[in-house]
Amino acid sequence: MLYPAELRYSKSHEWVKVEDGVTVVGISDFAQNALGDVVFVNLPAEGDSVTAGDAFGDVESVKAVSDLVSPVTGTVCAVNEDLLDAPETLNSDPYGAWIIKVENVEDSEELLDAAAYEAFCSEEG
């Protein structure tokens, strides 16, 4: 499993990176591995509000449908529409295939650094 040190992680297995004041959100390597082959992604629209700890979309894999949980509260300013045509990118490049970008961030869940997230994942098995 990969745990890039420059990212922060939620306990629901989303990663977070801040670029030029915008929060970028994706799913972790641990999440994509647990999901199996991703076949569909349901995304919010630009301008939608997201709330830390609440679902903002879902990912359908060959195993199950799983909620995407927002690690931050704010407004969606960009959606990775490439995932609609190529959802499997979440498997092949989980840290390159961002899902949404959020601006006007007001709040966030408790985010873990890479070492703490790796320890959390090893406890989850």
What label would you give each PLM region?
Residues 61-64, 72:
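Periplasm/extracytoplasmic soluble domains of Gram-negative envelope assemblies
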Residues 49, 67, 73-75:
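Beta-solenoid/beta-rich acyl/carboxylate-transfer cores
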Residues 1-55, 92-125:
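Acidic, low-complexity mobile loops and tails
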Residues 12-14, 79-87, 93:
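Basic/aromatic-rich interaction segments and small domains that mediate binding to polyanionic partners
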Residues 70, 88, 112:
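Histidine-anchored, small-residue-rich loop motif
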Residues 18-21, 65, 78-85, 107-109:
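Short, conserved beta-turn/loop elements at beta-strand boundaries and strand-helix junctions
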